[in-house]
Amino acid sequence: MNVGVSASSHSTPTPPSDDPTDTAGSDLLSSTAEASTYTEFYSPIPAGYRKGYHKYVIVLGTVMSGLGKGIFASSVAKMLKDKGLVVAPIKMEGYLNIDSGTLNPYRHGEVFVLDDGTECDMDLGTYERMLDQNLTVRNFTTSGRIFSEVLERERKGRYLGRDVQWIPHVTGEVKRKLRELAAYGDGENPADVVIVEVGGTV
C-alpha cells in the first residue's frame, strides 16, 4: 500500500526579508529575554518596569576623575525635571567597597548620608539639593555591592545551578539596579529619565 504525501503538506521556509520594518524575529528575542532564567541569557525585568518607556542618560569621565560629572549630571537632571519629566539619578562607583562609609575622606571626600542611612558619595548631596528630592539606597551602588548581591543570589540558588559569570550575571545585576530605579522613579511616579553617573575612571 502506497502512502502518498501531498505537496501541500511540506512547507518551504520563508526567506528572510530585506524590509527593515519586518519584525519576524522580535517575538523570539522578546520571549528569550523574558524566559532568561531557563537559558544562558540573564536580563531580569523587575515588577513595574515598562520596556521602552524609560530613557537613560549616561555620564562618564573616561580616564579622568574629578571633572565635575556630578554637577553636570545633576544640572541635566534639573533641566529635565523643570520640563515636567520625572527623573531618577544614580551614582555607580567602580570600587569594591560596599559603600563609601569606610573610605578615607582625604582621598575620596566627605561621606554623604541619605535619610535611609546609606553612606554614599558627595554627588548624591548635589542631586538632592538640585532636584529637591530625597534619595534612597536605590540611587547609589558600587561594584562591591553588585558582586555581593550576585554571590548572595548564587548561594540561594537563584541562578538555577549555572556557572556564574561576568556576562550575563554581573551585567544582569547592573540592569536590574537600573530597571528597579526606573520603576521606582522619584518614589511617587516611575522615572521618565534615569541619569546614570559612573564614578571614577573607565
Segment roles from a protein language model:
Residues 1-202:
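Flexible phosphate-sensing "switch/lid" loops adjacent to ATP/NTP-binding sites
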